[in-house]
Amino acid sequence: LEAAANRTADLLHSIPDGDLPVKGSDWTVGEVGAHLVFGLQGLAQAVEGSFDTVSPYIPDTEVFRDRLTAVTAGTLELLPERRPSVLAKLVLDAAQTFLTVTAERASDEVVRTPWYGSQASLSMGGATRLLAGEQIIHGYDIAQTVAHRWPISTADAVVVLPLEMIPLVVNPATARGHTANYEVHARGGPRFVVRFNDGVAAVEPARGQTIDCHLSADPVDLMLVVYGRISQWGPIARGRLLAWGRKPWLGLRFKNLFFNP
């Protein structure tokens, strides 16, 4: 997380205009920076059991996308700063605060995340990986906007794959009634099973379950597809995203079963 935040801060420092529209987004560079700051601050507060800042913006719905959209819009108003150079320092400060408050916590300790769902939670390790992933993926967005190189290593992509988020980000409209087992092979990384039972997803270690569809993916492409930054069709055409098994056609549907995390 520290390395990812440092990288994002360096990128923000290099951009003079916080009002620059981010490519493929409704946000500006300044708004993306503010979002990254609050993400770090909000989870640091959650680790300490405080939800006072975020609670007023949580709507009365259990739909992940609606809750997160409302909370994100509301919390952006709490941080009016949009100058990239100032936000760069705030990102570093907020990352350090999060690392400080979690330094003595076990990686499997649970932290509540009510902005995702009333009963939603992540492990401490999962929260840290999620925040690192946010730095990488939103840094990618900003870098694309200013034509700045932003290489993502296989190791980084493997570490920040948001496995704990998978059950939370199921799209109830597209997953309704769906029952199937998918085994995902992140090349050079983990193998895990996503089990759907009547539209409800769970993530399990791969241990010989009956599998309907195997998916093999380059971790970087998988990360960008999962976060909705690229279409699945390019990696499929290049052999970097493959499906096989008893029902290989289910692979084409897999991404659409989820909201972007």
Give, region by region, the residue ranges found by the protein language model.
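Short, Lys/Arg-rich amphipathic segments at extreme N-termini
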Residues: L1-V22
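Amphipathic alpha-helix face/heptad-repeat signature
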Residues: L1-A4, L87-L90, A94, A127, ...
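Short, contiguous alpha-helical
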Residues: P16-R65, P114-A173, L222
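Amphipathic, well-ordered alpha-helical segments in soluble domains
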Residues: A4-L11, G39, A94-T97, V101-E104, ...
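A glycine-rich beta-turn/hairpin centered on an aromatic-Pro dipeptide
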Residues: A157-D198
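Short, helix-capping/interhelical loops that line the mouth of catalytic, cofactor-
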Residues: L43-E104, D108-V110
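C-terminal interaction segments
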Residues: R207-P261
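Acidic/His-leaning functional-site neighborhoods
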Residues: P190-H214, D218
